Amino acid sequence: NIGAAGQPPRIKNSLHSHFTAEVFMIHEGTFEIYWGLDSESRTVLSEGDVVSIPTRCFRGFENVGEQYGFLFTVLGGDDTGGVEWAPKVFEAAEEHGLVLLEEHGVWDTHKAPIPDGACRVKVMSQEEASNYDTYTEAEMEHRISRIENLVYQTNAPLSSGSYGSIGHLRVIGLEESVIPGGDGFEMNLMTADQGGGVQMHSRKE
């Protein structure tokens, strides 16, 4: 369940939630990640930074840099169960004439009337949405791996060799990782000098 999003500066991704954990890894640019029913908490991530957003927590992101930005997304588990949108997303869409229909997807009412018999996707009530979890910025910081704070493993089997040093770090995992607990998968970071490579080796995983 690996995806990606590319966005020009000042473009936002609307508040949503998943049924499994969602991980953002910044590949290019600078993004502001925000969460909570009213986007009340936020933090800025740069290239190489990783954040794991828990389930039952509305989240979104905006490219706050000056260049085109690109991030990878990873969802835990084999079945992510879909996506839920915050009520304010539907309200904002309707201001522009957009509605979400069960069989037709996003429908622009400025271009054509809603087809006869079409059903709108049920919108979560404000009361239901208010029961979703939120986290302070300090709490979310424990679920963030920042590139400038990384300390690579000193006993990694790839730390030396004829191809040059290769740094290894377990970003997400069940143990000995920057973001502990696991999200249904592991994420490892490896760095090498340009032109480097690895010889045959094995790992306990």
Where are the regions a protein language model picked out?
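Double-stranded beta-helix
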Residues: F58-Y135
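A short, N-terminal "cap"/entry segment at the start of jelly-roll beta-barrel domains
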Residues: N1, E102-L189
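A short beta-strand-loop-beta hairpin characteristic of the jelly-roll/cupin
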Residues: S17-E47, C57, G197-E205
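Conserved short histidine dyad/triad with adjacent acidic residue
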Residues: G3-H18, G173, E186-K204
